């Protein structure tokens, strides 16, 4: 009878370890594995190697688990036949099945999931060693299963999961509310385009390049913008962009006879379909704060500032000189009114 108890114990122990190891390896976050591997801990490095190619280590664990369950059940059945009467064999088989399910599967997998990181680090090196031993058998299984499992690799995470984790982290107190909002807004950068963020042409402040500083003095002083668009005869004929500070400095120095165009700097142009994340990179590379947005026909659709793009991340930025909190919204309303006057449905 002692032989049966010992055999059952060995089967449950082996099956439990395999189930626990499998659950731990699947449950430990990939980001956590990469973070741990940076410490040059041998177990962490082994764990990263396992997660990089999971099919063989998991195949090894599954093979071992089945060896314990199948061979163990056969051995236990043979021993039970010697010591138990036929009438008790059905009851014994039911009890053995229940023990394997509870102590060989459910409890070990629950523990493996709950303490995934610690268990995964503990078993990483032994699993790699066992994988080498069982390589021929696992390779054979791979060749049989490849036609059914071959396909595009599924990404380890996606945008929706990261957003959800940010929200979950905020609710659990791991990150602050403003940090959660910032993470959520980052993903808007590749969803929004220049046309969504720009100040449309109907509300753009601009000056004619042919006029002198003296002629535009009042307009320059009253302008609320630090950068002013300079055009030729029409708004689509952009000559450049002038800094209000440069214009005022020239006026103070008695250079009112100069034309606005003389003080204009070259303008940078971007298509209205450019994504916000690309725009941000453009602003960084060009070291500009204002760019002209052009439509598909090459006409001026509006202007966009670095602040417009940054506000996607931070929310509305309003300083002491701002008279209108949302120029884009005002511009949209004006554009709809103009279209209505012309009999065109907005």
UniProtKB/Swiss-Prot annotation:
Keyword annotations of the record: CBS domain, Cell membrane, Membrane, Repeat, Transmembrane, Transmembrane helix
As for subcellular location, the record says:
Cell membrane
InterPro entries according to UniProt: CBS_dom, CBS_dom_sf, CNNM, Ion_transp-like_CBS
A Gene Ontology CC term for this entry?
A: plasma membrane
- Sorted alphabetically, which Pfam families does this protein's record hold? CBS, CNNM
What is the membrane topology listed in the Swiss-Prot or TrEMBL record?
Multi-pass membrane protein
> What PROSITE patterns does the entry give?
CBS, CNNM
Membrane-traversing stretches? 1-21, 58-78, 87-107, 121-141
Which stretches make up the CBS domain? 198-259, 263-320
Q: Which domain of life is it from?
A: Bacteria
Q: Which residues form the CNNM transmembrane domain?
A: 1-179
Instruction: Give the similarity note.
Output: Belongs to the UPF0053 family.
Q: What is this protein called?
A: UPF0053 protein sll1254
Q: Which organism is it from?
A: Synechocystis sp. (strain ATCC 27184 / PCC 6803 / Kazusa)
